[in-house]
Amino acid sequence: YAFNYCFSQETQVFFNVNSWYNDTILNLGGYLMSNTILRNENVSVTLKSLGGELTSIKDASGTEYLWQGNPDFWSGQAPVLFPIVGCLRNGTATIGNSKTCSFGRHGLARKLEFTLVSSSETCAVYSLKADDSTKEQYPYDFELQMIYELTDHGVKISHKVINHGDIVMPYCIGGHPAF
């Protein structure tokens, strides 16, 4: 199951399943990855800074609703797809008269480290900002914010894309949760 949104300024997705915050640090394959856990009385979610990805949705009984990954098939849980959903023909696209974009399937966000901007027991905001490395692939001054907010029986996920540049910035955004 995947959902995609193209050229949107803000999108929201709700997952529902029938107050506590924790932050842990893991070092996986050279990445310094931070996990954030959000909890209320009915649901808990785990988020990781690598890719700003949701990695677990559990109800109060501990039932897991999100695919936990299997490298033999697919190791992801719910990657964020940005600035493209799917792939580009021949891996590149020219936008306007001179902007060339080049990246693999589903863009670049899922493989980059996000910064935890703010958090509480039931809400976390992760941010990915353009830098010299991202501009080599996607030549725009962007910021992607992932906002995760617990509801009574689920999690509300908001994608906020900010264009810090002065030219139009085409993009697609999507989520790829597996259940």
Protein language model regions, located:
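Short, Lys/Arg-enriched N-terminal segments with co-localized hydrophobic residues
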Residues: 1, 5-7, 15-32
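Surface-exposed acidic/polar loop and edge beta-strand patches at domain peripheries
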Residues: 27-158, 164-170, 177-179
